[in-house]
Each structure stands twice: as structure tokens, then as C-alpha cells.
UniProtKB/Swiss-Prot annotation:
Gene (UniProt): rpmG2
Alphabetized HAMAP family for the sequence: Ribosomal_bL33
This protein's name: Large ribosomal subunit protein bL33B
Organism encoding this protein: Limosilactobacillus fermentum (strain NBRC 3956 / LMG 18251) (Lactobacillus fermentum)
Gene Ontology molecular function, alphabetical: structural constituent of ribosome
SUPFAM superfamilies with a match to the protein in the record: Zn-binding ribosomal proteins
InterPro entries per the UniProt record, alphabetical: Ribosomal_bL33, Ribosomal_bL33_CS, Ribosomal_bL33_sf, Ribosomal_zn-bd
Coiled coil: none
GO biological process terms held by the UniProt record: translation
Similarity remark: Belongs to the bacterial ribosomal protein bL33 family.
Length: 49
């Protein structure tokens, strides 16, 4: 079952990305390196609750 999630920047805490994940394959919180438009660089983004 795929679920829509929001990714939050770890440095500026802005929620800029929406994505989906499969809870059966990835039960933990998702962490991806994505581009932050506020900081103009690639930063770690974490799944929000």
C-alpha cells in the first residue's frame, strides 16, 4: 500500500516536497538528499508525521 508523505528540510524546516512510499517495504522514516530552494543547496530531507 503506497502512502503520500511530505518531506521536510532538516536545516530550514520548510516542507517543499511531496512523494509516496510503500509502508511494507520502508516502515522507517524516509530520508532523502534533495535540493532546498531557500538555501540553494542539497540538504537532507526527512519524512514528516
Amino acid at each position: 500500500m503506497r502512502v503520500n508523505i511530505t518531506l521536510e528540510c532538516t536545516s530550514c524546516h520548510e516542507r517543499t516536497y511531496l512523494t509516496s512510499k510503500n509502508r511494507r517495504n520502508n516502515p522507517d522514516r524516509l530520508e532523502l538528499n534533495k535540493y532546498c530552494p531557500r538555501e540553494h543547496k542539497v540538504v537532507l530531507h526527512r519524512e514528516t508525521k
